[in-house]
Regions:
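Surface-exposed amphipathic alpha-helices with a cationic face
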Residues: 1-8, 114-119
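Glycan-recognition surfaces
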Residues: 21-60, 104-168
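An active-site-proximal structural segment forming one wall of the substrate-binding cleft
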Residues: 51-81, 117
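Feature marks short, surface-exposed loop/turn motifs that line or immediately flank catalytic pockets
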Residues: 19, 84-86
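Short, well-ordered coil/turn segments that N-cap beta-strands
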Residues: 7-11, 74-76, 121-124
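Glycine-rich tight-turn/loop motif centered on a GG-T
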Residues: 1, 32-34, 92-106
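Hydrophobic faces of well-ordered beta-strands that scaffold small-molecule active sites
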Residues: 11-15, 78-80, 127-128
């Protein structure tokens, strides 16, 4: 970061905090934090599993780790990405008869994490990003003043994407 700043440039970082790789220290320490329906094979995308954002311990971990990174360096910009659909909607924290609450609790947990991080760092520009615009909605626009809708840069496709997102 200091080297980039020394060149007169502002530093940006790209996070994908809602995902975890099984080949990571975090997963090895907390495999129960990854969402997986018991008795079924885990659904992986890009060799990742989704963290259970409905859990307060997961939220607290992400808030602490991300804030530590942002507090430690002169970071101007953060891209917050999610590159997969959530498929294994299951929480080890809730009994089977309350699993219908998990996705809603996941989103509430995500809002808490973003509130704690973004409000703590009002001078950092946060940009939302999700594969194919899968998380482009009014609530996300509250957190991200700009949004990267898609990596598709074909001119005709971009016109359609921008037209569609203009309705939000």
């Amino acid at each position: 970061v200091e080297g980039v700043n020394a060149l007169g440039l502002e530093f940006g970082i790209w996070f994908e905090p809602e995902m975890v790789s099984e080949d990571s220290d975090l997963y090895r320490a907390h495999p129960d934090w990854a969402m997986q329906i018991p008795g079924r094979h885990a659904v992986r995308s890009r060799n990742q599993m989704a963290l259970d954002m409905s859990r307060k311990d997961v939220q607290d971990y992400l808030i602490e780790r991300i804030n530590a990174i942002l507090d430690d360096a002169n970071i101007y910009y953060v891209k917050w990405d999610i590159n997969r659909s959530l498929a294994d909607i299951w929480s080890n924290e809730l009994p089977a008869d309350r699993q219908g609450e998990v996705y809603h609790r996941y989103i509430l947990g995500l809002y808490r994490v973003m509130d704690e991080i973004i409000l703590t760092h009002p001078d950092i520009l946060f940009e939302g990003c999700s594969g194919g615009g899968g998380r482009y909605d009014a609530a996300m626009l509250h957190y991200y003043p700009q949004y990267w809708v898609s990596d598709n840069n074909h001119p005709i496709d971009r016109l359609k994407l921008h037209y569609g997102t203009s309705f939000v």
